[in-house]
Amino acid sequence: MKKILLTNDDGYHAKGIKALEQALEKMAEIYVVAPKHEKSACSQCITITAPLRAEKIKGKEGRHYKIDDGTPSDCVYLAINELFKHVCFDLVISGINLGSNMGEDTIYSGTVAGAIEGTIQGVPSIAISQILSHRNKNTPLSFDLAQKIIQDLVQNIFTNGYPLKGRKLLNVNVPNCSLQEYKGECITPKGYRLYKKEVHKRTDPKNESYFWLGLHPLEWQKRENEDRLSDFDAIASNHVSITPLNLDLTSYDDLKNLESWHKGMLK
């Protein structure tokens, strides 16, 4: 039977990872290693200056752990190299995140980092996020569409193989709409996220300052000379966005220009 490792950055008890396990439990043998507490926006942080403690969850056949103060990267690293080192995983899936991971979000994202760590460890990996924008807070959060999408993707991978070669992963964002409103899937490049320089300064009872960094609305800028819809455009039109991400951050287009610039500096 196929074996899938799940992680997230919202924490072991988050609704998203429970929905993810529920969606896949009949398709594969599921293992879960997730942070004990929320680790949103921790990026690729890995713990090397403190010990990590793994708590085995009772009643889960030894396949569930939560990592005290662990990050998503810690969880995947520890799962593959120690906790389940006897298991050959077919997939690592990180999510379902509560909120988008598009554009530059992918640099900050702990959810994407979990999938990146799986890729680094040589396992095909997917990050999946559920958009929350414009959701009526009086309406219960539904993962129905996200569950359908991940089931379809995983089945396609099991049938036809993982579509990417080398150190690459899939980043999936699911619009906040019903199955009836859903328009289909788009293969997209990342868009350009527009961040506001928002900092909220407060004063505590001891008259000392503290700060909250602002949460930003989903605003983006069109990519130049790009005919494809970006991930933001797809979501805005009730499409699922599927974006291939590459771990290699080298700007190859700039190598020759940089060589010329550097030669000039040495004269």
Swiss-Prot record:
Catalysis performed (reactions): a ribonucleoside 5'-phosphate + H2O = a ribonucleoside + phosphate
Cofactor descriptive note: Binds 1 divalent metal cation per subunit.
GO molecular function, one term: exopolyphosphatase activity
Cofactor: a divalent metal cation
Secretion signal span: none
Transmembrane helix found in the keyword field: no
Broad enzyme group: hydrolase
Binding site for a divalent metal cation: D9, D10, S40, N97
Cited function: Nucleotidase that shows phosphatase activity on nucleoside 5'-monophosphates.
Record-linked PANTHER family: 5'-NUCLEOTIDASE SURE, 5'_3'-NUCLEOTIDASE SURE
Protein name (record): 5'-nucleotidase SurE
Organism listed in the record: Helicobacter pylori (strain Shi470)
Lineage: Bacteria, Pseudomonadati, Campylobacterota, Epsilonproteobacteria, Campylobacterales
